[in-house]
């Protein structure tokens, strides 16, 4: 009996140590990533001409920063919308134009992290996107809910539009059946 308790205590201690080690590695990696974001953010201070479509950018590369004043939130925007990229911040849909360009720029984020408060946005709220091409202010036009497989939210638009997408319902456990969409129009750059 005493030996069993000793074995269990050793296992518990080992698991605790491993868990602590994993947590410390994750904290270190997050701090390292945040430092790289600050470096990339500093590069955004040099305006570049706005590029039209399909600029080759590496997946996971920081392309800008999104700020939503009403939510008091600012996040990095990275190229790509797969889970790997969305763990880094807000993802830019690769087949959409860059923010600030005439057409539909689509950004996606996880409902349980960067876009957890997206449902609080209302018509007229501001969304500010800063890239190496400049700072672009968008005004929310509307929000709505679609099925997860609805591709109409990523279609081209005749004006500079920003479309934000996240899974819905916000507190759903598992793979969400719907998407929450916010559409905003460029008002200033």
Residue spans for each PLM region:
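Solvent-exposed, non-transmembrane regions of membrane-associated and secreted proteins
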Residues: 2-189
């Amino acid at each position: 009996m005493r030996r069993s308790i000793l074995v269990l205590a050793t296992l518990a201690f080992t698991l605790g140590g491993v868990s602590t080690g994993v947590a410390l590695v994750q904290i270190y990696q997050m701090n390292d990533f945040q430092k790289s974001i600050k470096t990339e953010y500093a590069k955004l201070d040099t305006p570049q001409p706005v590029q039209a479509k399909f600029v080759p950018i590496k997946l996971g590369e920081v392309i800008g920063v999104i700020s939503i004043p009403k939510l008091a939130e600012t996040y990095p925007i990275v190229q790509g919308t797969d889970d790997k990229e969305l763990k880094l911040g807000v993802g830019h849909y690769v087949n959409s134009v860059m923010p600030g360009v005439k057409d539909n720029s689509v950004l996606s984020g996880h409902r349980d992290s960067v876009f957890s408060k997206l449902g609080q946005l209302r018509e007229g709220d501001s969304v500010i996107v800063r890239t190496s091409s400049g700072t672009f202010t968008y005004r929310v036009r509307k929000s709505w809910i679609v099925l997860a497989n609805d591709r109409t939210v990523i279609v081209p638009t005749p004006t500079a539009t920003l479309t934000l997408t996240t899974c819905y319902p916000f507190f759903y456990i598992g793979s969400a059946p719907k998407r929450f969409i916010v559409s905003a129009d460029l008002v200033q750059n």
